[in-house]
Amino acid sequence: MATQHFTNGSATDDGETALEHIIKSLETPTMKCEGTHFDSHVPHTFVIFGASGDLAKKKIYPTLWWLYRDNLLPKSTKFCGYARSKLTIEELRAKCHQYMKVQPDEQAKYEEFWQNHDYAAGSYDQRSDFVALKERLSSLESCNCSCNRIFYLALPPSVFERVTVNIKDICLAERGWNRVIIEKPFGRDDVTSKKLSDHLASLFHEDQLYRIDHYLGKEMVQNLMTIRFANKILNSTWNRENIASVLITFKEPFGTQGRGGYFDEFGIIRDVMQNHLLQILSLVAMEKPTSCQPDDIRDEKVKVLKSIPALTLDDMVLGQYVGNPNGVGEQREGYLDDPTVSNDSNTPTYAQGVLRINNERWDGVPFILRCGKALDERKAVVRIQYRDVPGDIFEGNSKRNELVIRVQPGEALYFKMMTKSPGITFDIEETELDLTYEHRYKNSYLPDAYERLILDVFCGSQMHFVRSDELSEAWRIFTPVLNEIENNKVKPIPYVFGSRGPKEADQKTSENNFKYYGSYKWIGKK
């Protein structure tokens, strides 16, 4: 059944399935928190610019299908793709098909989904093409009533300004709200980001803009606030008196896979650290907001970002992967072997930065951000490492407590602690209190990050989207070191494809009060 994708049909106390409960809540007009519902009976149109591209076929269209299939969109939702490529609906459908995960018993619903689609080919800078698009949207909506429109810009930065001007001048709904979803990159530095933000502010109100960072849609990232502020045992220790250091890690086991040309323009710092990892840091470190309203939360994120000094080169370790002669396939090729990358490129594929927060709660606690490609595993994890126990009586055998929030893969929350080894001796050992989602929540489906975020746009919740002042502070922190790296042509440290990364990164981590014991590996419950 289609509902198995979302909840496996688990029931609430009144007999509703969890999915039915969610659908009902989305249609409820009286909710305590902003952005938790939509008007199901008002027509909505979802317009995808860049509809023929990779992001659209791999993420956007599959996400829209999953939401449509599970009845999580307003009842009268239509979809329209727009790109330069001349495609029929059937050709567009064929491009997307392998990513849609359609089950045999969902075929009728899938046909219905595509019957609600249109597609228009046109340029991104010709006003006449946008006039034609407006006419197609009006025809698709086919009603003389109010209609809400969402515009998703899955586009390269080079066409961004012209497209947004044409949307504003020509394509907005006249009797309904309009919302614009924007994909990164949000500029290359503080200057280009401000230029883009000023341009958007001249066209749209901030409450119409949804700057998407898909990491903010991940289950464990969204869980950070609850972990912190709904548990006194953790909240009361969340400070410099108890926490020694924080390590936020993002690792990918693959290289650029022939797409290094795009990556080479931005590098790992802009691609991952300045956005995904810094957003996680802000949720870990921010003060308690006055409520769960989106702007109360984003206000606190901005406050903590303002307390972080700009990074310098001394705070960084930079690396670039080289081929592994003992590897197989792609592992034998280094970054510079990618034919789309310049032979003398100094672009880092690995970066580690140590950030400091100059406020009362975190003064002296290093926040270590590390990310890289072509490493030994796929993993995103937050490690909150506590200080050593004062007055040790266990002859140096006691290890630090550590709260570990595993973002991906295999969502989990576990707390590393010391216990007596079972048996007749009085030895101690490291173990964990473990909440592994796939075992504790067997009947629950964890939706893809894009599902959560696109649904948030329909509901009008900006809680998990980046505000312009957040973006400004992020670039203030990173622009000086990016300029220093590029102006001085800093050479990254070579590391072997499939390794942990440069050894210098582990040394820098140790210097910043994070102890890596290497004596214990979490494997999750069997």
UniProtKB/Swiss-Prot annotation:
EC number: 1.1.1.49
Residues that coordinate or bind D-glucose 6-phosphate: K184, H214, Y215, L216, G217, K218, E252, D271, K373, R378, Q408
Binding residue positions for NADP(+) 2: R370, K379, R383, R406, Y414, F415, K416, D434, L435, T436, R500, Y516, W522
Main location: cytoplasm
GO biological process: glucose 6-phosphate metabolic process; glucose metabolic process; NADP metabolic process; pentose-phosphate shunt, oxidative branch
Top-level taxon: Eukaryota
Keywords: Carbohydrate metabolism, Cytoplasm, Glucose metabolism, NADP, Oxidoreductase
Listed Gene3D superfamilies: Dihydrodipicolinate Reductase, domain 2, NAD(P)-binding Rossmann-like Domain
Catalytic residues (positions): H276 (proton acceptor)
Primary role: Cytosolic glucose-6-phosphate dehydrogenase that catalyzes the first and rate-limiting step of the oxidative branch within the pentose phosphate pathway/shunt, an alternative route to glycolysis for the dissimilation of carbohydrates and a major source of reducing power and metabolic intermediates for fatty acid and nucleic acid biosynthetic processes.
Family of the protein in this entry: Belongs to the glucose-6-phosphate dehydrogenase family.
Protein name (record): Glucose-6-phosphate 1-dehydrogenase
Gene assigned in the entry: ZW
